[in-house]
Amino acid sequence: SWANLNTFGR
């Protein structure tokens, strides 16, 4: 999920 990528704070 894109939300998982959002965890990186990008």
From Swiss-Prot:
Record's keyword terms, sorted: Calcium, Hemagglutinin, Immunity, Innate immunity, Lectin, Mannose-binding, Secreted
One term under GO cellular component: extracellular region
Domain of life: Eukaryota
Classification lineage: Eukaryota, Metazoa, Chordata, Craniata, Vertebrata
Protein function: Calcium-dependent lectin involved in innate immune defense. Binds mannose residues on the surface of the Gram-negative bacterium A.salmonicida. Shows agglutinating activity towards horse erythrocytes.
Organism this protein belongs to: Petromyzon marinus
GO terms, biological process: innate immune response; positive regulation of erythrocyte aggregation
Location(s) in or outside the cell: Secreted
Assembly notes: Forms an oligomeric complex with the C-type lectin 35 kDa subunit.
Name recorded for this polypeptide: C-type lectin 65 kDa subunit
Gene Ontology molecular functions: D-mannose binding
